[in-house]
Amino acid sequence: MALQFTLNQDAPASAHVDCIVVGAFADKTLSPAAQALDSASQGRLTALVARGDVATKTGTTSLVHDLPGVQAPRVLVVGLGDAAKFGVAPYLKAIGDAARALKTGPIGTALLTLTELPVKARDAAWNIRQAVIVSDHAAYRYTATLGKKKVDDTGLTTLAIAGDDARALAVGIATAEGVEFARELGNLPPNYCTPAYLAETAAAFAGKFPGAEAEILDEQQMEALGMGSLLSVARGSANRPRLIVLKWNGGGEARPYVLVGKGITFDTGGVNLKTQGGIEEMKYDMCGGANVIGTFVATVKAELPINLVVVVPAVENAIDGNAYRPSDVITSMSGKTIEVGNTDAEGRLILCDALTYAERFNPEALVDVATLTGACMVALGHQTAGLMSKHDDLANELLAAGEHVFDRAWRLPLWDEYQGLLDSTFADVYNIGGRWGGAITAGCFLSRFTENQRWAHLDIAGVASDEGKRGMATGRPVGLLTQWLLDRAEGGN
């Protein structure tokens, strides 16, 4: 965790912390905690806002020192923008802005009072949960491979949250831990995060908690199961594949929810070598796997009363003389044959065997998560994941969960009219569908291996990581998936 969290019900003026975080709207209206500090300081805060020394525009933060009558030596005022437009997005932005500002200063402890602000269609528990998740995300720093480079460990370490809902705090912390676990795996370089490392890390976590267990299948075990599609992708790499299976037994005899995550630890494209820019970001091609593992972490930490199974096919798509080729015909675990049209459409080839394997758990619902297609990014950008399902109830559950926590998805069609694009003369199915509708035809391919399941597909290519040299894994959609499971544990939305 980037931060430690506690609950605090002290009066703002008497709180023993290094800094108190309050808010101010564009019309200069102060948040309730800010009003309390203003009263304690005999109008000092109002005067600073009135003369422009404290900004109130969205995205601004102003640090005020030594307010009279206030125990804390600093007050951070966060601009909240237009009060009439204040809602989920401005609230989450304000929390993130505050955490980033606190992390850069000489402030070890702080009290966040923004949780007192009413957010339309949300309750106090939501405010607390999301404050924890967003502030920890904003405070995260990657340090695993910095070596001798100086790591700045100054700044905020403990954030007290105004409120009294201990369960909301616990669920928020659990979700934040899951997000950070996923981000850390996603950010590791591919010479560190190999299939074996990913499997060992996941198994090590599961081994620490009663009710959690892990099973790691090696190449020989997968071959015995007939996973010819997955193993074909693995043929060109010196880093041998693993199938990671994690189980959380919190729901008695109930059928489990099953998450399957694409775990391509590095994607060269194979024989269809990636020639355009962006190959250096292909370490993020395992973020589907990292994020379902992160969701498992959140579920275990929150002790949700459900059964959960996570399956991650962990494979490196590399090139050598034994690598699979375009025009190869391979046999999947389901028995269906696949003609390889492009070796860079490998994610669906490992997922189809993992989805077939997942059937043995008799899922209540089956959801796969994958950085599957650039086409999804072209269609939807970086703001939302793509969602495909033939099951309206499941799709609506996932969409609602994403909206609730602002980790959103957008539904794309999965109509039968697209299926013909996957026809093959030489096999049961072709692994690519041509130039148009690539995200949808990828979903159609997976649907052929989930025909008897209540299944949905999340294409997270656009949301799993930030672009560019300084980009990092985001941990999305751990928030969406954890909220979906929390909703199921509570008996519905």
From Swiss-Prot:
- The residues that the entry says bind Mn(2+) 1 are D267, D344, E346
Q: Give the domain of life.
A: Bacteria
Instruction: Name the reaction it catalyses.
Output: Release of an N-terminal amino acid, Xaa-|-Yaa-, in which Xaa is preferably Leu, but may be other amino acids including Pro although not Arg or Lys, and Yaa may be Pro. Amino acid amides and methyl esters are also readily hydrolyzed, but rates on arylamides are exceedingly low; Release of an N-terminal amino acid, preferentially leucine, but not glutamic or aspartic acids
- Binding positions for Mn(2+) 2? K262, D267, D285, E346
Residues in the active site? K274, R348
User: What CDD domains would the database entry show?
Assistant: Peptidase_M17
What's in the keyword line of the UniProt record? Aminopeptidase, Cytoplasm, Hydrolase, Manganese, Metal-binding, Protease
Its top-level enzyme class, in one word, is hydrolase
* Compartment annotation: Cytoplasm
Query: Needs which cofactor?
Result: Mn(2+)
Q: What is its EC number?
A: 3.4.11.1, 3.4.11.10
Q: Does the keyword Manganese apply?
A: yes
Cofactor annotation comment? Binds 2 manganese ions per subunit.
Q: Which family does it belong to?
A: Belongs to the peptidase M17 family.
Q: Which HAMAP family match?
A: Cytosol_peptidase_M17
Please identify the protein, giving its name as recorded.
Probable cytosol aminopeptidase
Which organism is this entry from? Xanthomonas campestris pv. campestris (strain ATCC 33913 / DSM 3586 / NCPPB 528 / LMG 568 / P 25)
Q: Which gene encodes it?
A: pepA
